[in-house]
């Protein structure tokens, strides 16, 4: 039996930890009385111990989250913040006990008014004082925008900025040391919101991680809407079943997988892939469940073509090959894309009965001319952000089934041209990484585990975690040359099958050997 003398250090450490926890809990429960900020109504302040599976009874059903596991002790502050006489955002701040002196804002997705609790849990668990808002409305529909321009303005830019202003004040009020640096982490609409901050509020963040950004958003809505006009409804002679999309995908891989030097089921650079479909067009008498008709082949060609406007101007680049299986159930399913239908019904035409099956590029012209509150988020002069010392890191999955990765390359080129700077100069403040085998923000067939979300987390090492890579860039001046991704054996949380270093654009990954394609050192950025 160990002596009491040997146990004393452990008992003392345990007592200190409990005392610290009690102090933090007491500080949290008394914090509500200290909050007196303009336009802020505190709904509640709760201490949440680490390990809690937090129930979320007030979260809108369409947001799809009823609970969230919280890994570290946090002080949870729920608020309503007025943004005008007729609008407000629902805002939460999660202030962790293991605070590292860093502030962070999360973003949103789609058209949704959903607080992303998984991002709050993820980043507060890493020691960030984190805020997240509902973008000014509740649920995933675009209907709240109908005849409510103030709500729309919250969605476009005001929600995140308001959350930042309030969140920074709360952070300084709660922690004596305040915060040393501020960060942003978001994907999809969250990626667009990150770039909106870069463009419109250059002093809000020191570092912005913006994934699969939905900028060029009005044209994105039109691009998503136009797929129905290509595929037609289920059963039409232009429609492809999921099985036919699988056949198409296999043929695309046969033609394009080996371009990067390795046949591993992953296309490292879809821009080099221009599928020729003649090999899978039906021969006379062949079973049409095993091949494509001429009209179906035309459908595929149209899907892999850019969208041009009524005057021939490029609106949106093509969908990248390699994403077709995942996109088939969402974008090519024989129904109008819901977000696009909502946008046109409730914002563009203010007509809930507008028929989304009748969409044409003439509608795209109407929508783009409106561009309410500059939703496009397509401004290419980000010199103010650069002058403020900010860093922006963007990534895009090359299997993205919702937002073409080609659009991120298009914006990168626009910034370089507008600011008249070459890639090596852009690298000083703006870096873009293409993530092969990553679908929309997460998932996919490749090494998508880059730590951009809780579900893609592998570890907190900056070499393996895109958020912590940004922290290292901002705080130590060490900019990431590659982003290492993990390929999981059986989805998120399973063992790591292999890792791959994803290249900084405009470089691309090429297999050189001599090791197997699962060896990250067998690949080179060229």
From Swiss-Prot:
Localization, per the record, is:
Secreted
Disulfide-bond pairs as recorded? 28-75, 63-114, 187-441, 256-273, 282-291, 503-525
Per its record, the protein catalyses: feruloyl-polysaccharide + H2O = ferulate + polysaccharide
Task: Read off the Gene3D superfamilies from this record.
Answer: alpha/beta hydrolase
Can you tell me which residues bind Ca(2+)?
A: 257, 260, 262, 264, 266
State the function annotated in the UniProt record: Involved in degradation of plant cell walls. Hydrolyzes the feruloyl-arabinose ester bond in arabinoxylans as well as the feruloyl-galactose and feruloyl-arabinose ester bonds in pectin.
Please identify the protein, giving its name as recorded.
Answer: Probable feruloyl esterase B-1
């Amino acid at each position: 039996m160990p002596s009491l003398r040997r146990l004393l250090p452990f008992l003392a450490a345990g007592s200190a930890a409990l005392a610290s926890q009690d102090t933090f809990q007491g500080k949290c429960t008394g914090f509500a009385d200290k909050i007196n900020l303009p336009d802020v109504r505190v709904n509640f302040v709760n201490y949440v111990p680490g390990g809690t599976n937090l129930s979320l009874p007030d979260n809108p059903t369409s947001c799809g989250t009823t609970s969230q596991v919280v890994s570290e002790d946090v002080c949870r502050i729920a608020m309503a913040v007025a943004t005008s006489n007729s609008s407000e955002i629902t805002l939460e701040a999660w202030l962790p006990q293991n605070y590292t002196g860093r502030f962070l804002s999360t973003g949103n997705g789609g058209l949704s008014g959903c607080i992303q609790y998984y991002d709050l849990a993820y980043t507060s668990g890493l020691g960030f004082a984190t805020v997240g808002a509902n973008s000014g409305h509740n649920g995933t529909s675009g209907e709240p925008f109908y005849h409510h321009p103030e709500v729309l303005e919250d969605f476009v830019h005001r929600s995140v900025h308001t959350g930042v202003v309030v969140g920074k004040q709360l952070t300084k009020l709660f922690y004596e040391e305040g915060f040393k640096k501020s960060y942003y982490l978001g994907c999809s609409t969250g990626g667009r919101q990150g770039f909106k901050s870069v463009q419109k509020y250059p002093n809000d963040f020191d570092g912005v991680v913006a994934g699969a950004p939905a900028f060029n958003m009005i044209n994105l809505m039109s691009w998503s809407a136009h797929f129905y006009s290509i595929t037609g409804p289920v059963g039409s002679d232009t429609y492809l079943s999921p099985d036919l999309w699988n056949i198409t995908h296999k043929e695309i891989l046969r033609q394009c997988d080996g371009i990067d030097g390795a046949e591993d089921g992953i296309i490292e650079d879809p821009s080099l892939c221009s599928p020729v479909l003649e090999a899978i067009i039906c021969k006379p008498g062949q079973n049409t469940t095993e091949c494509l008709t001429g009209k179906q082949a035309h459908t595929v060609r149209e899907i892999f073509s850019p969208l041009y406007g009524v005057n021939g101007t490029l609106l949106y680049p093509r969908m990248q090959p390699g994403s077709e299986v995942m996109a088939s159930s969402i974008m090519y399913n024989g129904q109008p894309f819901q977000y696009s239908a909502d946008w046109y019904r409730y914002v563009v035409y203010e007509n809930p009965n507008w028929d989304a099956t009748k969409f044409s590029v003439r509608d795209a012209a109407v929508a783009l001319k409106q561009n309410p509150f500059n939703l496009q988020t397509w401004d290419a002069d980000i010199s103010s952000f650069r002058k403020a010392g900010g860093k922006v890191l963007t990534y895009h999955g090359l299997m993205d089934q919702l937002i073409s990765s080609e659009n991120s390359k298009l914006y990168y080129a626009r910034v370089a041209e507008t600011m008249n700077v070459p890639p090596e100069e852009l690298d000083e403040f703006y870096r873009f990484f293409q993530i092969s085998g990553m679908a929309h923000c997460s998932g996919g067939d490749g090494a998508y585990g880059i730590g951009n979300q809780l579900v893609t987390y592998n570890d907190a090492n900056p070499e393996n975690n895109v958020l912590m890579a940004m922290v290292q860039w901002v705080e130590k001046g060490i900019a990431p040359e590659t982003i290492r991704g993990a390929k999981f054996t059986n989805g998120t949380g399973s063992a790591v099958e292999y890792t791959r270093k994803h290249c900084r654009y405009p470089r691309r990954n090429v297999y050189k050997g001599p090791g197997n394609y699962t060896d990250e050192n067998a690949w080179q950025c060229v």
